[in-house]
Amino acid sequence: ARSAAAGAARGAGAASAAGADDNEPAGTVPAAATFGEHLAVPGTLELADGRVLSARILPVEHGFDVVSYATAHSQEWLGESVLLDAQACGVDPVHGGSLWVSGPEAGDTMQPLGMHGQSKKISDLLGEAGVPVESRSMMPIVRTNIRGHVVWVAGIRPDERVKCTQDTKQLLELNIYSGHKPFERSQ
């Protein structure tokens, strides 16, 4: 099954990487990211292809089953929205903060959720998700900071290290959507 983000990347013909080599072997990523900006938490960031990334913090009430809720949320939104542990992402629940959003860089790895701490190359993850090679440089990669670890390959997969646990006190909700804010769903 291909994710909605992969579909958006395929449909964004104008969002092809500037200078991307069509002869580049499958599964490779350009040597450097083609964009990079801070995403304020809470806040939104408009991407060059017209999609928008948003971030907000949600409190967790005592006794709430945050793990089940985060899992159900992810399944309902088909990867376009994810709930993560705000503290694990380096975001202060009171003062907020920022995350770094850029394209993938050569050699990028992450620990995809569900792989129990095993690392995987971002280029491999994008290939498995069906993202065309020419669109991969524009895929938003959300990191803790400029040199920090990956927390979410937007629309594809979060990182194991930032997943919600029963100890999660504040949720970080990240969304990616096209052009207009999605409707709010009741909780």
Regions found by a protein language model. Name each.
Residues A1-Q187:
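AMP-forming adenylation/ATP pyrophosphatase catalytic core
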